[in-house]
Amino acid sequence: MLGTVEGDLHDIGKNLVGMMLGSNGFNVVDAGVDVTAASFVSAAKESNADIIALSGLLTTTMIYFPVVIEALGKAGLKDKVKVMIGGAPVSRAYADEIGAEGFAEDCASAVDEATRLMTLVTKSI
């Protein structure tokens, strides 16, 4: 599942990542743009997501990446899903800082990162 974080309407990168993941066998659920933390949580539950990919282009929206991760924790989903982030203002160091398990700098590396994250996914029965 992927979406652009709250306050960000940019979708080209998100759409490219979605197409690359889909063409590599991933079932992709696109939550859209300007997605609130609560909407990410709802969509993750509805889609039974294994990975949530958060996208953002604006530095002003970076504050919403950890908000989504915190909301996933409060909803009891953080141990069931892996979070991957990407976009111009974010980095591997930022992913580590906010508790995201994955980072992709472009759509090609997003496929590799999602594949790696799938090996870490554990679903509760």
For each feature predicted by the language model, list its residue ranges.
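Long amphipathic N-terminal alpha/beta scaffold segment
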Residues: 1-13
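Cofactor-cradling patches in redox/metallo enzymes
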Residues: 14-24, 29-100, 109, 113
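A charged, well-structured terminal subsegment
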Residues: 111-125
